[in-house]
Amino acid sequence: VARRVALVDIEATYTPDWGENFGIDNEGLILVRPTLLSNCVDIIQALLENEEISLVVLDSMSAIGTDEEIGKSMEDQQMASGARFWNKACRKFQAAMNSNPTKESTLIVINSAYQKTGIAYGDPEVIRNGEQLKRTKSLSVKFKALKKLNAKVDEGEIVIGRNISIECVKNKVGVPQRSATFFYAYVDYGGTQAYSTD
């Protein structure tokens, strides 16, 4: 059964022309751009329950503030409001995917890692918006940018892309702790010899 894909583009960075370069069928893609987090969660829940949609992509988890945060002054402290909200949202998403056992639903959540300052021991890397997503997700893949690659052209040299490392840090549906690297090309450089800048 052919089903559709939905992109919840909170960052508002997706452009149809650029997506078409990667083979995305813009006619079949459902593109939504919510402005409030509460609307975002309701939309994702409805998409996951929709029989015609099998894949929902959220880009990105850290790009939108809570309704409470947006509606108040910059001086007002909102302690962990995003974490509390996303903890509840993850449970709603899980319930939506489990509501129909015969329907295959997949939710891809893009998030960002940050370096926490003042950490003398242990891992300073933190993921925003609470711990619920770590417990809920079945598969977690970490992407990290590596060396930029340049190519010599008639005008000099240009950056044509960079190597990306990926690591499967959690996997409930397969073998975890696997890693790989791949080359992400920025432009079609016509097979020009590439070399590392580092």
Model features per residue range: what roles?
Residues 1, 54-56, 107, 193-198:
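Generic low-polarity alpha-helical segments
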Residues 2-88, 92:
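Conserved inter-motif catalytic segment of the P-loop NTP-binding fold
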Residues 47, 79-196:
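Phosphate-binding/switch region of NTP-binding enzymes
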